[in-house]
Amino acid sequence: MDLIHVVVLALIQGITEFLPISSSAHLILPKEILGWPDQGLAFDVAVHVGTLTAVAVYFRNDIGKIIIGWLSSVTGRGTDESGRLGWYLIAATIPAALFGLIFDDLIETHLRSTDVIATTTLVFGVLLWVADRKPAETKQLRDIALSTAMIIGLAQAVALIPGTSRSGITITAALFLGLCRTDAARFSFLLSIPVIVLSGGYKGLQLVLSAAAVDWLAIGLGIALSAVSAYICIHYFLNFINRIGMLPFVIYRLLLGVLLFIAV
């Protein structure tokens, strides 16, 4: 890959992975508009590692508490709030994992098109706007039930359709279910960790089995740039979301969807 391709694509992945604007919609733009080649499996693995590093470092304290609480519940020493959240995250990951295993080939073959991505970018952008305009509720992470987590998990499975936006659809579902904006985003970001691990691990296995040549400079740069940009986005999104709401992202998605249709 050319250096400029590595820089641009890594920044796109890092910036868009955790914002509700669809990373796949943005990654297809250089290919459709500029004629850039596909970034390849190795680079996909690299940016997965980068975004996973960002969210794991940002939520390191939460992750530590969740792991300790979950282990306590497993060993019969009682289940606290963090332990329950750990179980909820596991349960909410199952739908996306199953759907990914079953429908991965179908999605890659038939749904990774500009038309599909443009349509889902528009449709789920409007849905995000509707969810954000609901009467405000103050339900927090400690208030959610297993059923709430499972519904958000099912919504995450829908994000396997390119253009949906994993963070966008999970935040949308959480808002519909009454979570405040900040905790809707926090649950979405925590839920991304096992999904990125599974997706990145699967792609990593494919890479190993393919025995393809690896450009280690591109890999290292991709990891670093996607990690730093994703970390910055998580930080500012969580700090400003209650003030700015979802409307700026909705407007952006609508403009992006129209641009994609024009680019076809």
Curated annotation (Swiss-Prot):
Additional facts recorded: Bacitracin is thought to be involved in the inhibition of peptidoglycan synthesis by sequestering undecaprenyl diphosphate, thereby reducing the pool of lipid carrier available.
Membrane topology classification: Multi-pass membrane protein
Sorted UniProt keywords: Antibiotic resistance, Cell inner membrane, Cell membrane, Cell shape, Cell wall biogenesis/degradation, Hydrolase, Membrane, Peptidoglycan synthesis, Transmembrane, Transmembrane helix
Protein name (record): Undecaprenyl-diphosphatase
Domain of life: Bacteria
A GO CC term attached to the entry: plasma membrane
Chief place where the protein resides: membrane
Database matches in PANTHER family: UNDECAPRENYL-DIPHOSPHATASE
GO biological process entries: cell wall organization; peptidoglycan biosynthetic process; regulation of cell shape; response to antibiotic
Gene name, Swiss-Prot/TrEMBL: uppP
Catalysed conversion reaction: di-trans,octa-cis-undecaprenyl diphosphate + H2O = di-trans,octa-cis-undecaprenyl phosphate + phosphate + H(+)
Transmembrane segments: 1-21, 39-59, 87-107, 111-131, 144-164, 187-207, 208-228, 244-264
Primary role: Catalyzes the dephosphorylation of undecaprenyl diphosphate (UPP). Confers resistance to bacitracin.
Subcellular location(s) of the protein: Cell inner membrane
Signal peptide boundaries: none
Top enzyme class: hydrolase
Family note: Belongs to the UppP family.
UniProt EC number: 3.6.1.27
Pfam family, one: BacA
Molecular functions per Gene Ontology: undecaprenyl-diphosphatase activity
